């Protein structure tokens, strides 16, 4: 573990080593670690892909507000999706898998959309029916009414 501090961390028991799997790779951490801290200590920075465009995601915070730390825990019939890695305490033998990728996490097929980022900038779908102005007459009547009249 090259990314771990050699001292500190009053909640971590460095005498009790725990093994776990992330995407099939055998890794290890210590008792008192969260799954997120153990992944970071094992130099696992990429933990998932964005839902829509498959852009790489990593940890940005350490609490319950972390948006990118959702992993699938378990295997087979006991698979539990969308578990937060920042709040899940590490235990021996846990199996964690990243989400939202096709193929391996590092070589995601869906990430081909990165090459089309000039065509699809962030928020492009919010501007779909704004221009041209003269055409707005033809599609404004397609919107549903906000209130129902009885």
Where are these regions (language model features)?
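Charged, low-complexity intrinsically disordered regulatory segments in eukaryotic signaling
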Residues: 1-12
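Eukaryote-biased recognition of intrinsically disordered, low-complexity regulatory segments
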Residues: 11-23
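Iron-sulfur (Fe-S) cluster-binding segments and ferredoxin-like electron-carrier domains
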Residues: 20, 38-41, 45-48, 60-112, ...
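Short, contiguous acidic and Ser/Thr-rich linear segments
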Residues: 27-31
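Short, structural beta-strand-to-alpha-helix junction motif
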Residues: 34-36
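Helix-enriched interaction subdomains in cytosolic or periplasmic regions
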Residues: 129-138
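Conserved small/polar residues in nucleotide/adenosyl-binding loops
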Residues: 140-146
């Amino acid at each position: 573990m090259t990314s771990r501090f050699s001292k500190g961390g009053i909640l971590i028991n460095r005498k009790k080593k725990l093994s776990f799997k992330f995407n099939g790779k055998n890794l290890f951490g210590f008792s008192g670690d969260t799954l997120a801290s153990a992944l970071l200590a094992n130099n696992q920075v990429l933990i998932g892909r964005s839902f829509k465009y498959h852009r790489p995601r990593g940890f940005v915070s350490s609490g319950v507000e972390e948006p990118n730390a959702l992993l699938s825990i378990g295997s087979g019939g006991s698979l539990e999706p969308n578990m937060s890695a920042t709040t899940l305490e590490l235990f021996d033998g846990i199996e964690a898998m990243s989400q939202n990728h096709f193929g391996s996490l590092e070589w995601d097929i869906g990430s081909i959309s990165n090459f089309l980022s000039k065509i699809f900038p962030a928020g492009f779908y919010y501007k779909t029916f704004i221009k041209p102005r003269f055409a707005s007459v033809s599609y404004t009547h397609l919107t549903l009414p906000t209130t129902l009249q009885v």
